[in-house]
């Protein structure tokens, strides 16, 4: 085995150990499994310039195909995070299905001219319209989400759009201060990127968060309501209905059986657990 192969193997093992370590903290009877990042054909306005020029969607996968894959991979609750819209979620809710409303919004850090993706959950159709406007300024976007108790996750934190070239490390400090939740396992990214992201998030001690705030020249709690709490999530980022649900997040819901017996919806339990 050459050095490159050995390196990739060790990265894979480290990522698996990180996942197993986190999973072991949740009692087996109090787990909800959800893929927090997947797409169907309602992701029809791609971010990529070529896709916009050609007028093609990011995927032609139907909702039924996506749901079948999610079920086959053992998810307990469904969300569909299409780009900048939650049409699939609203359609499923209209059919009487229990769904956690979600979308992947393309947002901009205006002071750096850097584009990022923010997974957002628990909003209403009216709030979706407002989020679509605010996404051009991620600071206003996050403020609105905090004000209305909407859950946000920074998707694939090491992948962003920077037309002016590689941005300064201050961008990473700003992102670390902006968000509480980070997608550290993305099914479309190589193990090295996921491990590097997990290491970055795990390194956000209280001391490091204060150092980040000094470098960013802002108070630690300017945006985050709980600046010292950092959570890690996972999602398949599936666009082909091939891997949806094979990567995801295990949520901890204490007294899950009692909540289900009392008639609580899985979507509400998932939202509260996030």
Whereabouts are the PLM-identified features?
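Domain-core and long-helix interface of multi-subunit machines
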Residues: 7-25, 34-57, 125-248
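Divalent metal-dependent hydrolysis catalytic cores, especially in the metallo-beta-lactamase
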Residues: 51-53, 59, 65-87, 150-153
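Acidic, His- and aromatic-enriched active-site or binding-groove loops in soluble protein domains
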Residues: 100-106, 172-188, 255-267
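Eukaryote-biased recognition of electropositive, low-complexity segments
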Residues: 234-236, 240-274
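Short, charged, surface-exposed secondary-structure boundary motifs
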Residues: 108-116, 244, 266-267
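Generic structural signal for hydrophobic
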Residues: 69-70, 92, 145
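A basic- and aromatic-enriched beta-loop-alpha substructure that forms the phosphate/nucleotide-
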Residues: 114-128
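Short acidic, glycine/proline-enriched helix-loop-strand junctions
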Residues: 88-103, 204
